[in-house]
Amino acid sequence: MIDNKVLQYCSSKLACEETMGELTIHPRVLERHPQLTEEDVRVAWENTYYEALRPDSPNFPEYLWIGADSNGREIEMVGVPTVDGWLIYHANTPLSKRTRNEVEDARRR
């Protein structure tokens, strides 16, 4: 069960860098995307330059982040806050068309 105090205090990664907590990367991410390593995802997480809450997600509160790894590749990451920090259960490079469209639509609003 997710602790609502944690979610209220740290409702987004960018809003609370100093209290981010632990980052967990689901093992399936690396199994499905062998071009990524755990280090690639962690570096991209640390270099996040785009964050969006997905309010209509069935996994609410689900976030989309985009960051750059140590090779300069853009990595899309999707995850949720947990009691201890954050769980990333999707990561991919290059950015998917769906993600690019989502970012473009958000910029138009």
Question: Predicted segments — roles?
Answer:
Residues 1-109:
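Ribonuclease/tRNase effector modules and their secretory precursors
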